[in-house]
């Protein structure tokens, strides 16, 4: 059964599969509706060129558009001001400044997640206590991480 009770300006929402309750209504600028899993507060509309749509867990304030070259969507921690595409191989999820040339993988032992300076060329740990973000090369031992 499709949900069509959308406010003006929205396209008809999609049919909600059993794990999704309810389906969401998306702005007319979006090509397709998206379905919101039970554990999500809200969903996000992504441009036609991006696949798939990203789901926003309760702890996330914003989401990220994942290019077709990436295999899975990622969630941006609350402390991040902007989002970034992170390769599937990166664990855990990290955030990086929009000016970064490439994604940054931060070792699992690093806490908390912080912004990566655009000058960072390889994986490393960034110290949140510094007034200006510092990127530590991967050559540093894991024990020296945040």
UniProtKB/Swiss-Prot annotation:
Tissue specificity statement from the Swiss-Prot or TrEMBL entry: Restricted to a narrow region of the hair fiber cuticle, lying approximately 20 cell layers above the apex of the dermal papilla of the hair root; not detected in any other tissues.
Task: Report if keyword 4Fe-4S is assigned.
Answer: no
Presence of keyword Repeat:
yes
| The sequence repeat ranges on this chain | 10-14, 15-19, 20-24, 25-29, 34-38, 40-44, 45-49, 55-59, 60-64, 65-69, 70-74, 75-79, 80-84, 85-89, 90-94, 95-99, 100-104, 105-109, 110-114, 120-124, 125-129, 130-134, 135-139
State the UniProt keywords alphabetically.
Keratin, Repeat
Q: Name one GO cellular component term.
A: cytosol
Pfam families assigned to the protein according to its UniProt record, in alphabetical order: PMG
Q: Where is this region: 23 X 5 AA approximate repeats?
A: 10-139
Q: Please describe what this protein does.
A: In the hair cortex, hair keratin intermediate filaments are embedded in an interfilamentous matrix, consisting of hair keratin-associated proteins (KRTAP), which are essential for the formation of a rigid and resistant hair shaft through their extensive disulfide bond cross-linking with abundant cysteine residues of hair keratins. The matrix proteins include the high-sulfur and high-glycine-tyrosine keratins.
PANTHER family the record matches: KERATIN ASSOCIATED PROTEIN (PTHR23262), KERATIN-ASSOCIATED PROTEIN 12-1-RELATED (PTHR23262:SF180)
Query: What binding partners and quaternary form does the record give?
Result: Interacts with hair keratins.
What is the similarity comment for this entry? Belongs to the KRTAP type 12 family.
What is the protein name given in its UniProt record? Keratin-associated protein 12-2
**Gene of this entry:** KRTAP12-2
């Amino acid at each position: 059964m499709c949900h069509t009770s959308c406010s003006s300006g929205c396209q008809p929402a999609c049919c909600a599969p059993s794990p999704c309750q309810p389906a969401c209504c998306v702005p007319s600028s979006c090509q397709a509706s998206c379905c919101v899993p039970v554990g999500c507060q809200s969903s996000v509309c992504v441009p036609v060129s991006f696949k798939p749509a990203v789901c926003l867990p309760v702890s996330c304030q914003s989401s990220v558009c994942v290019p077709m070259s990436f295999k899975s969507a990622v969630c941006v921690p609350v402390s991040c001001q902007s989002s970034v595409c992170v390769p599937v191989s990166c664990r855990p999820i990290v955030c990086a400044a929009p000016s970064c040339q490439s994604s940054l993988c931060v070792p699992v032992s690093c806490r908390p997640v912080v912004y990566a300076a655009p000058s960072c060329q390889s994986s490393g740990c960034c110290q949140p206590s510094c007034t200006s973000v510092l990127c530590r090369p991967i050559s540093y031992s894991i024990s020296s991480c945040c």
